[in-house]
Design a protein with these regions (language model features):
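Extreme N-terminal starter segment of soluble prokaryotic enzymes
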Residues: 1-7
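Short, glycine-anchored, charge-dense loop/turn motifs used at functional sites
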Residues: 5, 110-118, 226-234
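N-terminal phosphate-binding loop and adjacent alpha-helix
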Residues: 9-27
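Cys-nucleophile CN-hydrolase/nitrilase-fold catalytic domain and related Cys-dependent amidase chemistry
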Residues: 17, 26-114, 120, 183-203
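Short beta->alpha transition motifs characteristic of CBS
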Residues: 58, 109, 121-127, 224, ...
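CN hydrolase (nitrilase-like) catalytic-core segments centered on the catalytic cysteine
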Residues: 69-89, 150, 160-243
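Active-site catalytic loop in hydrolytic enzyme cores
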Residues: 70, 99-171, 183-192, 196, ...
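C-terminal beta-strand edge segments of enzyme domains
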Residues: 143-145, 210-277
Length: 277
């Protein structure tokens, strides 16, 4: 099965959900055309971490947070997913009221072609500082079976921890989507970990980063789609840009049955020390 993926690398305006959602829809129009015809160019469109709000605005997180699945950004993006007949992944600040008080998460949402929320992922490995002060850590690593493939999600710094991608791969993920806000000067680290997570698990990685400067942080972009042998298929530059690639999911099983036996030849009974440290 072949799946066409687009990563939409943008600069988000801090705290301005209306402007950011307008930009996101305009990028979808650029990919698919500005009429109501169903999009034949891509199946899955990925936006960055906290695309709806911007990243470096922790003082506004509580104000711009939304409950799922009925949040205001979801309504806009669900309509876009339905209009263009595409799956969409994007980042937002989630407000969870299940504990009787607002708890915030750094969350990404997966919408299907009908605009239905297939699922969400809450960032587990928060960056020390405003993230750890504002958000609660996520604790689950879901994989979603869709008609365009089995999709797992990580957010930015999660990719620095190989355990996350390994769990997703063991659960069957074929595509791991990585919305991110990875800042300069750490672009070489970004390159290494996206390719490493692909190679480690023989999966496709679609990593979408921010660009531009917020307050103190500058984001370098370099969004990329990486093949299951850890080689970059396509990479963006340092400005707003859309990259696309068609990936062949059948290639994953072919590779895993050949040289790339990284999942089959694991020796998990010897890994217990990891859990005791």
């Amino acid at each position: 099965m072949k799946t066409k993926i687009a990563c939409v690398q943008i600069k988000s305006e801090l705290g301005d959900k209306t402007a950011n959602l307008k930009k996101m829809v305009s990028k979808l129009e650029k990919i698919c055309g500005d009429n109501d015809d169903k999009c034949s160019k891509v199946d899955l469109v990925v936006f960055p971490e906290l695309a709806v709000t911007g990243y470096e605005c922790s003082e506004l997180y509580a104000e711009v947070a939304e409950e799922l699945p009925g949040g205001d950004s979801v309504k806009v993006m669900a309509e876009a997913a339905k209009r263009f007949n595409v799956y969409i992944v994007y980042g937002l600040v989630e407000k969870d009221m299940s504990e009787g008080k607002p708890v915030l998460y750094n969350t990404v949402v997966l919408l299907d072609r009908s605009g239905v929320v297939v699922g969400k992922y809450r960032k587990s490995h928060l960056v020390e500082g405003p993230e750890t002060e504002s958000f609660k850590k996520g604790t689950e690593y879901p994989v979603f079976e869709t008609e365009i493939g089995k999709i797992g999600m990580m957010i930015c710094w999660d990719t620095a921890y190989p355990e996350v991608a390994r769990i997703l791969a063991l659960k069957g993920a074929e595509i791991i989507v990585v919305p991110a806000a990875w800042e300069a000067p750490y672009d070489e680290d970004w390159d290494i970990v996206q390719c490493a997570r692909s190679f480690d698990n023989v999966v496709y990685v679609a990593a979408c980063n921010h660009v531009g400067t917020d307050n103190d942080l500058t984001f370098f972009g370099k969004s990329k789609i990486v093949g299951p042998t850890g080689r970059t298929i396509i990479e963006a530059g340092n400005d707003e840009e859309i990259i696309t690639a068609e990936v062949d999911l059948d290639r994953i099983s072919e590779l895993r049955e050949g040289f790339y036996v990284l999942l089959k030849d694991r020796n998990p009974e010897t890994y217990g020390e990891i859990l005791n440290r």
